[in-house]
């Protein structure tokens, strides 16, 4: 007795699916640009935050940032992980260090190296897809002038009436009503 056709077809389909998964895993990665790149970094790095260039490679001028690597070349999870920020201290370290300090010890606010509000505005521009021209100062001025021009054009009357009645040679409307 041989193998039934249904089972052999099922085995063939499963092996084909497995082969395709393996090929896709070794194939080229996905390219990410703009808002997709920012959203993916937020997802991968979660509460740790991330850098657009690796902090350890700032001295090396030839190193590429994440935009050059992920937008123009393929990008994978391992590469994205390298741009995640490392937290300064874990929660355990912070809680034990505060317990050691006396209660009357002054606590000064810690400065941030990464301004979240500035990043959020930049990320919002990336998501909205504003062109680079509008992000530049001159571009904003040109956009403002264009907006003012469009507003003035929109509020212009459709028909401009002449100040004098052309049929009666400049006679006023009172005289024309008396004349009838």
UniProtKB/Swiss-Prot annotation:
Residues 157-180 are annotated as: Disordered. Its main location: secreted. Residues 92-180 form a propeptide. Expressed in the heart, blood serum, kidney and skeletal muscle including the tibialis anterior muscle. The record marks 48, 58, 61-62 as: Important for interaction with integrin. Residues 1-24 form the signal peptide. Pfam families: IGF2_C, Insulin. Residues 86-91 are annotated as: D. Residues 65-85 are annotated as: A. One of its GO terms (molecular function) is growth factor activity. It is found in: Secreted. Disruption phenotype: Heterozygous animals are smaller than their wild type littermates but appear normal, reach sexual maturity and are fertile. Transmission of this mutation through the male germline results in heterozygous progeny that are growth deficient. In contrast, when the disrupted gene is transmitted maternally, the heterozygous offspring are phenotypically normal. Homozygous mutants are indistinguishable in appearance from growth-deficient heterozygous siblings. One of its GO terms (biological process) is positive regulation of activated T cell proliferation. Proteolytically processed by PCSK4, proIGF2 is cleaved at Arg-128 and Arg-92 to generate big-IGF2 and mature IGF2. Residues 25-52 are annotated as: B. It comes from the Eukaryota. The IGF2 locus is imprinted. Paternal inherited gene is expressed, while the maternal inherited gene is imprinted, hence silenced. It is differentially regulated in the placenta and fetus, transcribed from 3 promoters P1, P2 and P3 in both fetus and placenta and additionally from a fourth placental-specific promoter, P0. The insulin-like growth factors possess growth-promoting activity. Major fetal growth hormone in mammals. Plays a key role in regulating fetoplacental development. IGF2 is influenced by placental lactogen. Also involved in tissue differentiation. In adults, involved in glucose metabolism in adipose tissue, skeletal muscle and liver. Acts as a ligand for integrin which is required for IGF2 signaling. Positively regulates myogenic transcription factor MYOD1 function by facilitating the recruitment of transcriptional coactivators, thereby controlling muscle terminal differentiation. Interacts with MYORG; this interaction is required for IGF2 secretion. Interacts with integrins ITGAV:ITGB3 and ITGA6:ITGB4; integrin-binding is required for IGF2 signaling. Interacts with IGFBP2. Belongs to the insulin family. This is Insulin-like growth factor 2. It comes from Mus musculus. The gene is Igf2.
């Amino acid at each position: 007795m041989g193998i039934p056709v249904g089972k052999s077809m099922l085995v063939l389909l499963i092996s084909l699916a497995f082969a395709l998964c393996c090929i896709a895993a070794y194939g080229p990665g996905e390219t990410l640009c703009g808002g997709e790149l920012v959203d993916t970094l937020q997802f991968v790095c979660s509460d740790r935050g991330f850098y657009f260039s690796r902090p350890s490679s700032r001295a090396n001028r030839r190193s590429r940032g994440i935009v050059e690597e992920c937008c123009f070349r393929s990008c994978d999870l391992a590469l994205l992980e390298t741009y995640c920020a490392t937290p300064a201290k874990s929660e355990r370290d912070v809680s034990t260090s505060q317990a050691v300090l006396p209660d009357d010890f002054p606590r000064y606010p810690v400065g941030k190296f990464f301004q979240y509000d500035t990043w959020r505005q930049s990320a919002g521009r990336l998501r909205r897809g504003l062109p680079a021209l509008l992000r530049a100062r001159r571009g904003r001025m040109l956009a403002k002038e264009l907006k003012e021009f469009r507003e003035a054009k929109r509020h212009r009357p459709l028909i401009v009436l002449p100040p004098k009645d052309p049929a009666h040679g400049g006679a006023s409307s009172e005289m024309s009503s008396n004349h009838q």
